[in-house]
């Protein structure tokens, strides 16, 4: 009996010891908002500040950390943007310690330096929203948000400013949830300084209609929402960056803004002739390819937001852009033709000049809690000028296997002609001009009918576009395999002047209604009628019988047309002139079911689209006045399952019916260009495309582990492909649209990022992409041969891996990218490709307490697997930047940048399709140095804010402040012209 009692006592003591694990717990809240704060770093330290254990607060602000033994400890709590706090605690008798609520106050914004001790996590995921913490990405001094976006996991930024997040193109930029420069993502990327940004959110935003009705219209847009740092959204902010460099490079930028509770006004100016490339350091996206051509641009933009909470929202933006381009390119192509190939080379010089104005307004009024009125007008005006000149040639054999000379040089052409490889050669010149005016508007009124989800919406849209364009084209061609009666190679020329006025307008009315069937279940109905009209009336004047010469300059029409003054009408070619008029009547009828549950949302439905079209066409002596009636069907399904606030699964399906254009259906042959003849096909069927997407993400608090994966699949039945008939004698081709089956593609991606340690000092990020494309097309070798179905299968693997270390004054990273492409061609197995492109290298950011900052990156980029040995190259691209802050608070920064110090960056690209392989090389200035002078003046409102302003991304503790980022640019095109 005594043994039993003793055993029970020992068991109870053991259970008590297990129950009391010296667990320290609590909840972190914001002093001002009283809301829980997630992602707060909690560190348990010994009395001598030695690290013991750590944790991160969850989405409810809760945390727990276990003490290894009884004793006295320090509990350090820190988060970017908040004052750090240290609690002295004591654990005794192995008891747990409940801290209760721990309140954090916002960090005072110091111009002399923000006191930040924790290393912020790089990315978190909340359902289908990616939240990037800008302070975790250290960008060079003077940089704008483009440099920040390039460093984000899953992000891609192309040379033209196109942004992709997890494979989806970003269509809109928001600042603090408000629209910014509507319709223009580039202005934000090139002008917003990184140092005012606290967080970036990436998510799919529903359309204006979907937001108020809940009806999924398939018009979602991927957006980036830049959150401004606390304390910087009240007062004045300004940043001026003036940069000049060698090789006549310049890059200048100015930005100013005024913020208060309800108003936000921002003004930008930018001028550069560096393609606004920014600093080339850091990030795993480095590799082959500099800027394509020489480009100069100037921009002035303004954006204004006003908001009266729950009552009124007003956004407007105005933008002026001017650009000059000088693009020289050398192109080499192989065109797959049946069991053989044709080859072509070209040398092209293009000059361009563009001028545009754009204005947008978004006005939203909520007169009461049941009504929402939205009005969106916009207007734009633009002109563009172009000059072009090119030399090209076609061959029936690979020219590089016959001659070592340039295949476009006189010596090379003579050698190829003697070998019987020449098919044709051409010299072309052209001048173009266009003037485009556009105005559009949208009015939407939504009314809730009770509180159960019943609502009705009426919407009208209208658009008007007027365009005038002119062009002169001169072409001289030589056919080496077609002989004249005298036994010489055939030649011909075309000299034409085109005037093309066009007009387009449309209007639409839409009614939507949502009816609650039972709890959280809705039946939604939408009807939309659209009328669209377009007219084009091209007048073509043919001077092919005469030699035309003139001044090859912008709008230099008169110098070419003066010899024909007063008699221009006599040269109008009625056959080559083309008139077209198009009227389209469309009815969209959509029915959807919507289920809303605590764990999942489900939408499914179908849209039926009856369409009637009237087409009038006069061309090549043919007059057509035809009417077509078709019906398109588009089923859709969208399912979202919410595992938690940090984990989300989404499945999306959409089917789309597409009709061939009426011009494709007309049985007309267009032989205005003898080397490029096109035909219509009245037997074309509509195509049906099915798109499937699966998306999953999860975020684990422990070590900030983030996981994202998605799979996209697309297939098209009765896809429309051009059947190409190649003429071996002339090198010309005849194209005719045909239906074909077998076009499909699948792609998948996996992203993983984590902090290796609890303090976020060591980090790992990886992106994996796999894609497979099955391209099909028709090919035939001559007019007598039956067309053959050609299939090109392409497999792509892309990998990006980044490993980094960061502390208060230093960040080191090792980045690597891998691109593998395996392409097979059914009819041309000799053209199969297994190519590798990989890039890797270190980057460093170092900041000293006295305001000196050093950035350096080295990228080793390699190509392997190309049949042309000259393509299998290695490039060492080294960029560096040194900056120093001056004056009290460091408002002035002097910065020196060095681009491509080793002068090895190339401008080569390759494109592959079912019918061809094309390699292109561009002109560019990639290697230069630039000196920047940056000054900022910031006056923030509020008691704490008046003390100063926070550091930029990657803030370091106790360092005296650094200025905001910037840069200006522009330049006059130079280069060659034929």
Question: Model regions: which residues?
Answer:
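Membrane-proximal, glycine/serine-rich, low-complexity loop/turn segments characteristic
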Residues: 20, 60-64, 76, 82-85, ...
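A short, amphipathic beta-strand motif
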Residues: 22-30, 61, 100-102
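Short, ordered, surface-exposed loop/turn motifs in non-cytosolic proteins
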Residues: 32-46, 125
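Short Pro-Gly-centered beta-turn/loop motif in secreted/extracellular proteins
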Residues: 37-38, 64-72, 80
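Short, acidic Ser/Thr/Gly-rich low-complexity loop/linker segments typical of extracellular
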Residues: 47-62
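Extracellular/periplasm-exposed beta-strand and loop segments of Gram-negative cell-envelope proteins
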Residues: 280, 288-294, 327-335, 342-358, ...
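Face-selective signature of the C-terminal outer-membrane beta-barrel domain
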Residues: 317-319, 358-384, 423-616, 704-716, ...
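Conserved C-terminal beta-signal and adjacent last beta-strands/turns
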Residues: 798-820, 832-978
